[in-house]
Regions:
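Short basic helix-loop element that most often maps to the first helix and adjoining turn
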Residues: 1-8, 35
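A short, Lys/Arg-rich alpha-helix, primarily the initiator
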Residues: 1-4, 80-95
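Key DNA-contact positions within bacterial/archaeal DNA-binding proteins
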Residues: 5, 16, 45
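Residues within the alpha-helical elements of helix-turn-helix
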Residues: 10, 39
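Recognition helix of helix-turn-helix/homeodomain-like DNA-binding domains
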Residues: 11-28, 53-55
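Short, basic-rich loop-to-helix N-cap that marks the start of a DNA-contacting helix
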Residues: 25-38
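Short, charged recognition helix plus adjacent turn
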Residues: 48-77
């Protein structure tokens, strides 16, 4: 399995923040949830399920930023690669 330390690193967040999310003491933003999806290596379907479950808007391919994120999820990119692509396309990064 993936340790909390490794998940935190791959998700671009601190272990403390990650622990607070899992303990229900934090209500992460849509972008933070997507960071977590990349850290977990989630599929697009799993990411959409998590967003829906947490009451966030699903990724929508006609929105440029979302399309870049979808591409990253479909191609198994890591969070940092997707963030670089978002930045280079003048879109808001995930963190």
């Amino acid at each position: 399995g993936l340790s909390k330390a490794a998940l935190a690193k791959q998700s671009g967040m601190s272990e403390i923040y990650l622990h607070q999310i899992f303990a229900g003491r934090r209500n992460p933003s849509r972008s933070r949830l997507l960071c977590l999806c990349f850290g977990l290596g989630a599929s697009l379907e799993e990411a959409q399920d998590l967003l829906r479950h947490c009451g966030c808007a699903e990724l929508y391919p006609k929105v440029r930023r979302d399309a870049i994120i979808i591409f990253g999820l479909l191609h198994g990119m890591d969070l940092f690669t997707v963030n670089d692509r978002l930045f280079s396309e003048d879109e808001e990064t995930l963190f």
